Amino acid sequence: MSEDDSKKEPEPEETEAEIKHEEISREEDDEGGEFSTVTISDIEMLLKDTEIWDKLLRNELSIEEAKKMFDDVARSYSKADKKKRRVEKKPKKGKVTKKSDEEEE
């Protein structure tokens, strides 16, 4: 019986380790979900911002020039986002119209 008891004791430790591993896996899954929402345009914007910061740190730009460039980058990408939203909304309206047409018939 002592052999059975010694075998049973490590099991709770293994279970705790497994639980910790599962928790870490869940955290990684949660973090992975955040990265899946980053679009190519978001990455491009971040790269341009990084280039501006790099030039600013090398004293190739003044602070005012950098601010202007940051604003330009933000504006160009916000316009692109608005266009995407409009495109996404159009199919939704089309679906609603189809449903109303079916209801009329």
From Swiss-Prot:
What EC number is given for this enzyme?
2.7.7.6
Which Gene Ontology biological process is one annotated for this entry? DNA-templated transcription
Tell me the InterPro entries matching this sequence. RNA_pol_Rpo13 (IPR021985)
Q: Which Gene3D superfamilies match?
A: 6.20.450.10
Q: Where is the region Disordered?
A: 1-35, 70-105
Per the record, its GO cellular-component terms are: cytoplasm; DNA-directed RNA polymerase complex
Recorded GO molecular functions are: DNA binding; DNA-directed RNA polymerase activity
Catalytic activity annotation: RNA(n) + a ribonucleoside 5'-triphosphate = RNA(n+1) + diphosphate
Ranges annotated as biased composition (Basic residues): 81-97
Subcellular localization is given as: Cytoplasm
- Enzyme class of the recorded protein, top EC level: transferase
User: What is the first-listed, main subcellular location in coarse terms?
Assistant: cytoplasm
Q: Where is the composition biased (Basic and acidic residues)?
A: 1-10, 70-80
Q: Which UniProt keywords apply?
A: Cytoplasm, DNA-binding, DNA-directed RNA polymerase, Nucleotidyltransferase, Transcription, Transferase
Role summary: DNA-dependent RNA polymerase catalyzes the transcription of DNA into RNA using the four ribonucleoside triphosphates as substrates. In vitro binds dsDNA but not ssDNA.
Q: How does it assemble?
A: Part of the 13-subunit RNA polymerase.
Q: What family, per the record?
A: Belongs to the archaeal Rpo13 RNA polymerase subunit family.
Instruction: From the Swiss-Prot or TrEMBL record, give the protein name.
Output: DNA-directed RNA polymerase subunit Rpo13
Q: Which gene encodes it?
A: rpo13
